[in-house]
């Protein structure tokens, strides 16, 4: 919100500098982003009167004689297409400074002496987006009353201080000059002074010319007035200056009046050309699927049933709360104007403006809320301004559909409630003074009082809001420093936080380095490594396609990080991340996705460097699986690894799904060579786990076992097996023998070679047995080995060598 300091002083009688005002507002709840004076950096810019203007043959130039208040006219060569004799212009005399600190000097153009420069507004540093279109390609023409030789700043209000406010969603009442004036008046204990317009109505009633109706619950109220015999022309300079300083381009007097009322009241308005209506009944309704509308910017908008439209003869003529339609826009030939003032549901407007990427001053105010109490007042004010600036005749009365509550909202509390929460010792007289400054009504006493909150402050509705208002006006800096009276509560990690912290510690203990990757990625990468892809959740208006969809896996983001580092000659990497993936089982356009915590890691390169006594050792599947085994052992979880070829981006012979209680919770393996090539990375091993599943499976209680004093006994067994039999199948068979004293199963050798028949392999295991309460005997261990051998023979066809 850009606030004109000059305009503000017309509404509130304050005698403070803009800088002091900005500091005071920032400390009372409305942050000031900065203060800008458009004239800063500009100098020696004066009013010039073009006495004569001659075309220079065979050029686009003009040789002008300009009166700048000196004894003799000043000769200036100008190339602007709209320069002509008789107009008042902006002249930068030699030595002047214009935008970008450019200094004007005497010069010669095509051999003709030029003693200055006739300036456009762009050359004064104003943005193209706010300059009237009639002057966008030429010089600015000043009002007739401008005096040659005068500094131009006062004629264009370039000497005004523009205060930029950062308005939070709860203070949308400050999105208007009246709202800001009320705030400033409360801060300084002043009264507001709002100008009144003398509205003179004709004998003809508005209801004779137009009627309105509402056909949607998202239209809270809709009101109109009609102004006849208007003369569409440029607005007076003061109004153009005011709009440009607020960041709005002047269009014509009719449109400018609606924008003025928007800034003044915070009430969005629209003006229709009545003569372009096919019917005299306006209906505000929901759009129908398949309908479309060409808006004022010339774009065709395809509508949905979630959009609100203003219709005439059942045809959309405006996108309610967002932008008007081109078919009924005001132009130079318009004579009868229909003014619209309405209140639309903020959520509906937000959806429409977001879907169409069409945000406007009007839509932002409807989204945040408008003052119910001034809808009709703003409508009457706009009609009176058209009467004044466009010589229009205002039809009597207005037509309205839908009524809104305008009476103050009553909120009750007590003095004790206030003081306990602020740590103060305020008296009831203090409270009365503060609410009087705010313009709120107050009845009752210190035991219990009721505050009548005006509709302009729709953010105040509960006792806590009243406490905030008291604190703001009393002064946050005056609040005493106090300690909480309630006893403290010992902090405790949630199960999710505890698991996250433990996994992070284990990962870093394994030598992994934490990274944080983007949750937004491409639609392809979002599902690239997902075990069970769901509906894709995409942004409607992404900054780039690389950040357009919410990820459903974390590995793709980790591989981007691997690629980034490999490209910079860092090829030995061990990375991990704990973050969220986003699963969407419903409609992504209507429902939010489920956020699920995942853990993932990626390793590549060497785990051991070559030296005088050690060979270089590259990472492999077993390093990745070993990391997971350590993790699961420390979490006291038992998982299964099941080989899989179903993950297209993983190596079909070096990938396994991870099962916990028969449910897939993740995967581990080598990235498919084709995928690795696409990422420009070397052989890389990755794993990803669902941490929510881990948390659900964690044992609730930990049982500590006494360390036994009795020795363990170990037996080695070599097995001849079919080549297809996996290590997991062998472990499962050994465990199925049900030997309770078996405490460890370790694979220490795998052999395939000439001494083994084709299609076979040898696998050697070391089995450890221990009785925590007694010594084991050789006979007992022999029985255990017999049971295990039998299970291996029956289940995997193993032959003990």
Curated annotation (Swiss-Prot):
The record lists the catalysed reaction(s) as: tRNA(Phe) + L-phenylalanine + ATP = L-phenylalanyl-tRNA(Phe) + AMP + diphosphate + H(+)
- Bound how, and how many: what does the cofactor note say? Binds 2 magnesium ions per tetramer.
Q: Which CDD domains match?
A: PheRS_beta_core, tRNA_bind_bactPheRS
UniProt key word Magnesium: yes
Q: Which residues form the B5 domain?
A: 406-481
* Principal EC category: ligase
Cofactor(s), names only, from the UniProt record:
Mg(2+)
EC annotation from Swiss-Prot or TrEMBL: 6.1.1.20
The UniProt entry's GO CC annotations, sorted and at most eight, read: phenylalanine-tRNA ligase complex
Question: FDX-ACB domain: from which residue to which, for each copy?
Answer: 708-801
Q: What GO biological process, any one, is recorded here? A: phenylalanyl-tRNA aminoacylation
Q: Which family does it belong to?
A: Belongs to the phenylalanyl-tRNA synthetase beta subunit family. Type 1 subfamily.
This protein's name: Phenylalanine--tRNA ligase beta subunit
Originating organism: Streptococcus pyogenes serotype M1
Q: Which gene encodes it?
A: pheT
């Amino acid at each position: 919100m850009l606030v004109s300091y000059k305009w503000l002083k017309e509404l509130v009688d304050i005698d403070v500098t803009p800088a002091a005002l900005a500091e005071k507002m920032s400390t009372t709840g409305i942050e000031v982003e900065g203060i800008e004076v458009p004239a800063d950096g500009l100098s020696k810019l004066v009013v010039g009167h073009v006495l004569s203007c001659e075309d220079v043959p065979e050029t686009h130039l003009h040789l002008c004689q300009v009166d700048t208040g000196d004894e003799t006219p000043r000769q200036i060569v100008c190339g602007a297409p709209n320069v002509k004799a008789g107009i008042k212009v902006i002249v930068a005399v030699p030595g002047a400074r214009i935008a970008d600190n450019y200094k004007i000097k005497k010069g010669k153009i095509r051999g003709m002496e030029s003693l200055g420069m006739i300036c456009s507004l762009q050359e004064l540093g104003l943005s193209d987006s706010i300059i009237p279109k009639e002057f966008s390609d030429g010089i600015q023409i000043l009002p007739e009353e401008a005096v040659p030789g005068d500094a131009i700043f006062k004629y264009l209000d370039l000497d005004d201080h523009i205060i930029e406010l950062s308005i939070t969603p709860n203070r949308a009442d400050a999105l208007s000059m009246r709202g800001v004036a009320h705030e400033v008046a409360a801060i300084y204990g002043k009264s507001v002074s709002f100008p009144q317009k003398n509205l003179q109505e004709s004998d003809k009633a508005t209801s004779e010319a137009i009627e309105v109706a509402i056909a949607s619950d998202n239209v809270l109220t809709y009101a109109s007035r009609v102004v006849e015999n208007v003369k569409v022309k440029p607005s007076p300079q003061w109004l153009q200056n005011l709009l440009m300083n607020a960041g709005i381009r002047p269009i014509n007097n009719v449109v400018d009046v609606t924008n003025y009322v928007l800034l003044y009241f915070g009430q969005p308005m629209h003006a229709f050309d009545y003569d372009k209506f096919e019917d005299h009944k306006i209906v505000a309704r929901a759009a129908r699927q398949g309908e479309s509308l060409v808006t004022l910017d010339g774009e065709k908008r395809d509508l949905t049933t979630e959009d609100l439209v203003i219709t005439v003869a059942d045809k959309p003529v405006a996108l309610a709360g967002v932008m008007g339609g081109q078919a009924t826009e005001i132009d130079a030939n318009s004579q009868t104007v229909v003014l619209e003032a309405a209140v639309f549901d903020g959520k509906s407007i937000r959806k429409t403006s977001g879907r169409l990427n069409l945000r406007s001053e009007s839509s932002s105010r409807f989204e945040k809320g408008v003052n119910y109490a001034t809808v009709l007042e703003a409508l009457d004010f706009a009609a009176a301004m058209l009467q004044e600036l466009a010589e229009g005749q205002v039809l009597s009365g207005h037509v309205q559909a839908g009524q809104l509550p305008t009476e103050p909202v009553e909120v009750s509390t007590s003095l004790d409630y206030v003081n306990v929460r602020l740590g103060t010792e305020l008296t009831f007289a203090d409270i009365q003074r503060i609410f009087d400054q705010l313009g709120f009504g107050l009845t009752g006493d210190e035991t219990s009082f009721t505050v009548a909150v005006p509709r302009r402050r729709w953010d105040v509705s509960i006792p806590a809001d009243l406490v905030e208002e008291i604190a703001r006006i009393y002064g946050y800096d005056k609040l005493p420093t106090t300690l909480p009276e309630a006893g403290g509560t010992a902090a405790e990690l949630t199960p999710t936080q505890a698991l996250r912290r433990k996994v992070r510690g284990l990962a870093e203990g394994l030598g992994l380095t934490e990274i944080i990757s983007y949750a937004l990625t491409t639609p392809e990468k979002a599902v690239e490594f997902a075990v069970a892809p769901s509906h894709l959740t995409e942004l409607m208006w992404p900054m780039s396609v690389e950040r357009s969809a919410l990820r459903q896996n974390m590995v793709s983001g980790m591989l981007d990080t691997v690629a980034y580092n490999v490209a910079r000659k860092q090829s030995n990497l061990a990375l991990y991340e704990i973050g969220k993936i986003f699963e969407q089982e419903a409609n992504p356009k209507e429902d939010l996705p489920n956020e699920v915590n995942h853990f993932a890691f990626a390793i590549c390169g060497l785990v051991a460097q070559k030296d005088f006594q050690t060979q270089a050792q590259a990472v492999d599947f077993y390093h990745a699986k070993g990391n997971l085994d350590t993790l699961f052992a420390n979490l006291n979880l038992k998982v299964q690894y099941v080989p899989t070829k179903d993950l297209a981006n993983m190596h079909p012979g070096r990938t396994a799904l991870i099962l916990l209680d028969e449910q897939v919770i993740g995967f581990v393996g080598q990235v498919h060579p084709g995928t690795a090539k696409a990422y420009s990375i070397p052989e890389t091993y990755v794993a990803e786990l669902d941490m929510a599943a881990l948390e659900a499976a964690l044992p609730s209680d930990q049982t500590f076992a006494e360390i036994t004093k009795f020795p363990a006994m170990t037996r080695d067994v070599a097995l001849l097996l079919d080549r297809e039999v996996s290590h997991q199948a062998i472990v499962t068979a050994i465990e199925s023998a049900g030997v309770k004293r078996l405490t460890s199963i370790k694979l220490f050798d795998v052999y395939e070679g000439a001494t083994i028949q084709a299609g076979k392999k040898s696998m050697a295991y070391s089995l450890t047995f221990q009785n925590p309460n007694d010594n084991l005997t050789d006979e007992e261990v022999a029985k255990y080995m017999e049971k295990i051998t039998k299970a291996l023979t029956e289940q995997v066809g193993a032959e003990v060598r």
